Amino acid sequence: MAEKKRAQEQEKVQEDQKMQNEQNECEEVEKKLQECEEKYLRVHADFENTKKRLEREKIQAIEYSLEKFAQDLLPALDSLDMALAAVSHDNLNAEEAVKELKKGIELTIDQFIKAFNKNGIEVIEIEEGGEFNPHLHEAILQVDDAEKKAGQIVQVIQKGYKYKERILRPAKVSVAKGNE
């Protein structure tokens, strides 16, 4: 009987140990779960903060996207001011005033073109006598020209411009009708 009692006590001790081990395991799993939940909340908060920061930066980039371009245009505006100041002097005769004004306008055009090129805007290059391209040109006039084939460009009326690969404005041209 003592053996039976001892066996029962030993069985009870083993059950208690097993239960204690399971309880310890359960506590460890709960602790790990809590740690994972805390990590998740931190990562989620970091993600939300990053998302908000990127949205703010995007809005600022859009708001100030033209700032660099505007700064590049300021020298052209300065040239116009200087040209006006140069022709405003009373001691210039009409011919000198026109020369100064022409010089100022040419300088301004050069500065505009430099600012445009710096920002990815280019003049669409066209050769008179070249073929009309509806993607780059807009035919404003058709003219009789015995020296040119039908569809050849006779004259560039207004320059065209492109921004990178997009056409901002097609070049306005006159084209030959051709011989009928």
Swiss-Prot record:
User: GO CC: one term?
Assistant: cytosol
**Where is this protein primarily located?**
cytoplasm
Highest taxon above the source species: Bacteria
> MF terms per GO, please?
adenyl-nucleotide exchange factor activity; protein homodimerization activity; protein-folding chaperone binding; unfolded protein binding
Stretches for region Disordered: 1-25
Q: Where in the cell is it found?
A: Cytoplasm
InterPro entries recorded: GrpE, GrpE_coiled_coil, GrpE_head
Which keywords does this chain's UniProt record carry?
Chaperone, Cytoplasm, Stress response
One GO process term, biological-process aspect: protein folding
Q: Does the keyword Cytoplasm apply?
A: yes
Residue stretches of biased makeup (Basic and acidic residues):
1-19
Statement: the UniProt record of this protein carries the keyword Nucleotidyltransferase: no
Q: Where are the transmembrane segments?
A: none
Q: Which Pfam family is one of this chain's hits?
A: GrpE
Q: Which family does it belong to?
A: Belongs to the GrpE family.
What function does the entry list? Participates actively in the response to hyperosmotic and heat shock by preventing the aggregation of stress-denatured proteins, in association with DnaK and GrpE. It is the nucleotide exchange factor for DnaK and may function as a thermosensor. Unfolded proteins bind initially to DnaJ; upon interaction with the DnaJ-bound protein, DnaK hydrolyzes its bound ATP, resulting in the formation of a stable complex. GrpE releases ADP from DnaK; ATP binding to DnaK triggers the release of the substrate protein, thus completing the reaction cycle.
Question: Could you describe the subunit structure of this protein?
Answer: Homodimer.
Q: Report what the protein is called.
A: Protein GrpE
**From which source organism is this entry?**
Nitratiruptor sp. (strain SB155-2)
